[in-house]
A protein has these predicted regions:
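Active-site loop/oxyanion-hole signature of alpha/beta-hydrolase fold enzymes
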Residues: 69-73
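Short alpha-beta junction capping motif
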Residues: 76-90
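RNA-binding accessory domains that recognize and position tRNA/RNA substrates
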Residues: 1-58, 62-68, 78-80, 96-327, ...
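Gly/Ala-rich beta-loop-alpha elbow adjacent to hydrolase catalytic centers
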Residues: 86, 90, 95, 235
């Protein structure tokens, strides 16, 4: 398998991943502030040779430093002589390295806590905490804590129960936090990260959509050369922006956009996608009608991971079949893989527990005949949207709600059948249309319907019914790493529920999912 991955910048903050599901959130916050940041495996034997770190952040993680098998700091981290900020497990690694001691806490501390800083740390001499309140709310998630401070470090912040929550080195630009500044619940976390960039690393704030676009276009031209590219399009924002980037960089004549109709699309999706791609100026748009192939392969399959693997495998096989069956010599396969896709599939090899496989990165065969070109692999969803706007894509395309690569297969719990797909398509269409008509569509980051494997008793007229249940989900997010519940009025939800039951045969009950991410993921499977 050949990965051609665009690195949009060659300098910034290097984030070492020790298995935390918040790792990419650190990266996202840094980019929001205006500096490029990149994640590598915390166990890497050496730093990237083509990336200059202005500073280093050590992520949290599920390990205990007291375990012999726990991941440790590589020696090169200190040899680089760059500022270091350890977060949670990252702080505990620093405690161990400098000769301190850790202990297992009485219980895992998870949730909001109060941080009490030493007053001198928020003044001009306290670069990391400059301008912040002495007392503030932070987000804790740890099992171990400091039993004895290293001689070279000083505790500058504690929680209300006396746990060391912040420490700094006496002479070096090294600090540790026992809380997560990257999480929104840490009320001054973003300011702290900006202080680390500006005051500690002395790094430039120069990361924006303009630099993203220029670097990505340059990379595509350099990596693809004079070859032709086959772009795998799903109709979502990611693959559409990837196709537009490739066409912009190479010229539309060298780019063929292929949309695989898996039979797992939303209502009227196929015609909408084909027309949208042509409106982008792409001269070569092909639709592969593969519905029967996918439905046959998914027959009887109920495990969500198995569904994703099957879809991912067939997805690639269909594009390979198309490429080898045509005279044009495609050497590259373009995909809209995003950074969160990679991290949720543990694609960095950093040991983060796999939450779910993504069809772009989890179902690829080991011997892929086409070289992968993934222009968005280092970018987040909102950054992809920014690039789309920069390229002049229509707002209704750029601002379209995210849609998973496996399509409705991960929104049908249980077996996939033509009948169940029809029910879900119709229910989802009612929900989305209502959001648009009532002006809520652009207030919500993502909304969709889910078909549950549950039937319930109902009554219609004088007759008893025993029919399917639809769950509605609406969330707000910026990067898909965390998500809050969409604040839709109960009157609106009642209206949608009534409309679905009335218009969609086979459904007699509608429920609303009010779970955040975490603990849930956005999609149900």
């Amino acid at each position: 398998m050949n990965h051609h991955v665009a690195r949009p910048a060659n300098t910034g903050i290097l984030v070492l991943d020790y298995g935390s599901q918040y790792t990419l959130l650190i990266t996202r916050r840094l980019r929001e502030i205006g500096i490029y940041a990149e994640v590598i495996d915390g166990r890497s034997a050496q730093p990237p040779t083509d990336f200059t770190a202005a500073g280093i952040i050590l992520s949290g993680g599920p390990d205990s430093v007291q375990d012999a098998s726990a991941r440790r700091l590589p020696a090169w981290v200190f040899a680089l002589n760059k500022p270091i900020l350890g977060i949670c497990y990252g702080m505990q690694l620093l405690v161990e390295h400098f000769g301190g001691e850790l202990r297992s806490g009485k219980g895992r501390e998870y949730g909001q806590a109060r941080l009490n800083l030493a007053p001198e740390m928020v003044g001009p001499s306290g670069a990391l905490f400059y301008g912040m309140p002495v007392t503030q709310t932070v987000w804790m998630s740890h099992g171990d804590d400091v039993a004895r401070m290293p001689q070279d470090m000083v505790a500058v912040g504690r929680s209300d129960d006396g746990v060391v929550a912040a420490m700094v080195h006496k002479t070096l630009a090294i600090a540790g936090l026992q809380f997560h500044p990257e999480v929104n619940h840490s009320e001054y976390g973003k300011q702290l990260l900006e202080n680390f960039i500006r005051n500690v690393c002395r790094a430039a704030i120069n990361w924006d959509s303009g630099s993203m676009l220029a670097a990505t276009l340059d990379y595509i031209r350099e990596s693809v050369g004079s070859a032709n590219v086959l772009v795998a399009c799903s109709g979502g924002v990611d693959s559409t922006v990837a196709a537009a980037l490739l066409a912009k960089a190479l010229g539309s004549e060298r780019v063929t956009a292929v949309f695989c109709d898996t039979g797992l699309m939303r209502k009227d999706e196929v015609s909408w996608v084909a027309n949208a791609l042509k409106e982008l100026g792409l001269n070569h748009v092909e639709v592969l009608h593969s519905e029967a192939l996918f439905l046959n392969a998914l027959s009887g399959v109920t495990d969500p991971e198995a569904k994703r693997k099957i879809i991912g495998r067939l997805f690639i096989e269909e594009f390979e079949r198309y490429a080898t069956g045509h005279q044009a010599e495609f050497t590259h396969l373009g995909q809209g893989t995003l950074y969160p896709d990679v991290i949720e599939s543990a694609g960095h090899g950093a040991g983060a527990k796999v939450i779910k496989s993504h069809h772009n990165v989890g179902g690829l065969p080991e011997k892929l005949k086409l070289k992968l070109c993934e222009p968005l692999r280092y970018l987040f969803k909102d950054e992809a949207r920014q690039l789309g706007a920069q390229l002049g894509l229509p707002a209704d395309m750029v601002d379209r709600h995210p849609f998973p690569g496996p399509g409705l297969a991960v929104r049908i719990l249980g077996e996939i059948t033509a009948e169940r797909l029809h029910i879900l398509r119709e229910a989802d269409a009612v929900f989305i249309q209502a959001l648009r008509e009532h002006g809520y569509y652009h207030q919500i980051w993502q909304a969709f319907a889910v078909l549950l494997p549950v039937k319930s008793v109902g009554v219609m007229g004088d007759n008893r019914t025993y029919q399917m249940t639809i769950a509605l989900r609406a969330v707000n997010s910026t990067d898909a790493m965390t998500a809050g519940v969409g604040d839709l009025p109960m009157s609106f939800l009642t209206h949608v529920a009534a409309a679905i039951v009335k218009k969609v045969d086979g459904v007699n009950r509608v429920v609303y999912d009010i779970t955040t991410k975490p603990p849930a993921t956005i999609e149900w499977e």
